[in-house]
Regions:
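Active-site-proximal flexible loops/turns
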Residues: 34, 56, 129
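Short gly/ser-rich anion-binding loops that grip negatively charged ligand groups
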Residues: 2, 52, 56, 87
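Short glycine-enriched loops at secondary-structure junctions
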Residues: 28-32
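Catalytic metal-binding acidic patch
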Residues: 37-62, 66, 144
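Short N-terminal helix-initiation segments at or just after the protein's N-terminus
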Residues: 1, 60-70, 114-116
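The feature captures the alpha-helical scaffold/lid subdomain characteristic of nucleotidyltransferase
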Residues: 1-25, 37-46, 99, 103, ...
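Conserved catalytic core of two-metal-ion nucleotidyltransferases
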Residues: 63, 67-106
Length: 234
C-alpha cells in the first residue's frame, strides 16, 4: 500500500499540473516524498491513506480532476464539507483533500505556499502539520524526526526547515506556539537522534517576536483550551 500511495501521489500531482491545479502531497506520504534518503533506502511504513492540499480557488476543479484520475467521490461528505475538505476513493485507497486551509488541531493557511514545490508541501509546512498535533502519536513523532534528519535548519526559503517562516506562524498565535513547542519536546524526548534540532526549533519559536494577540492570549494560558480535536471540527 505504501508504494501504491506514493505512485498515486505522483499521478495526482502530475494530473493537477496538466490542469493548472497546484495539488501537493502532505501527511506521511508527503514527508516520505520529501526525504529522498529514506525513500531510497526503505523499508517504508504502511500508509492508511493519502493527504493532499489544493488552493482555495481550485476547489471547483477538484472533482473533475479526481474523476479523470479514476477516483470516486464521497458525495455525501463532499456535499457537506467540500468548501474546505473533500474525500475520494481509488485503487490505491482513500485520498483526503484539504482545500486552501489545513484544519486539524490548528489552522494553517496553505494556499499561498502550494506553488513553492512541485509534488509536496515545503519541508517547513510538512513539519508544522506534524507539530500542530496535540495528541501526538509515534507516527507523527517519526515523521517529524525524518524531516529533521534530512533537512538543515536555516533562515529563509529553500529546501530546508525555514526558522523565519515557522516564527511567522506563531507570531500572533499563542495556541499554535504552545502545541508546536510541546510536540517538539516530545520529539526530542523520544528521538535522541534529532533532539538537538528539535530543541533548536523550540528555542527559535520561543525567542521569536510575538504580536499583540499572542501576548493577550498568553495571559489566559492553559485555563482555556487552545486547540481543536479533529473529530470535533464541524
Amino acid at each position: 500500500m505504501s508504494d501504491s500511495l506514493l505512485d498515486a501521489a505522483q499521478q495526482l500531482t502530475s494530473t493537477g499540473e496538466e490542469r493548472g491545479v497546484a495539488l501537493r502531497a502532505l501527511g506521511g506520504v508527503g514527508v516520505l516524498m520529501h526525504c529522498p534518503v529514506a525513500r531510497a533506502t526503505g523499508p517504508h511504513r504502511a500508509f492508511a491513506d493519502l493527504d493532499v492540499a489544493v488552493p482555495r480557488d481550485a476547489a471547483r476543479q477538484v472533482p473533475e480532476l479526481f474523476e479523470a484520475a479514476g477516483y470516486d467521490a464521497d458525495k455525501r461528505f463532499n456535499a457537506l464539507q467540500g468548501d474546505r475538505r473533500m474525500i475520494f476513493h481509488g485503487p490505491a485507497g482513500k485520498v483526503d483533500v484539504f482545500v486552501g486551509v489545513f484544519e486539524m488541531c490548528h489552522k494553517l493557511d496553505l494556499s499561498p505556499r502550494l506553488g513553492l514545490e512541485r509534488e509536496t508541501l515545503t519541508a517547513s509546512d510538512l513539519l508544522m502539520t506534524k507539530l500542530q498535533v496535540v495528541e501526538v502519536n509515534q507516527k507523527d513523532v517519526d515523521d517529524a524526526a525524518l524531516l529533521l534528519s534530512e533537512h538543515e535548519l536555516r533562515e529563509g526559503p529553500g529546501d530546508h526547515i525555514d526558522l523565519a517562516y515557522l516564527s511567522t506562524l506563531v507570531y500572533d498565535d499563542w495556541g499554535l506556539w504552545r502545541t508546536a513547542t510541546g510536540t517538539l519536546g516530545v520529539v526530542a524526548e523520544r528521538r535522541d537522534d534529532v533532539a538537538a534540532p528539535a530543541r533548536a526549533i523550540a528555542g527559535a519559536l520561543e525567542g521569536a517576536p510575538k504580536g499583540k494577540r499572542f501576548r493577550m492570549r498568553a495571559r489566559i494560558g492553559e485555563r482555556k483550551r487552545w486547540y481543536e480535536l479533529p473529530d470535533e471540527i464541524k
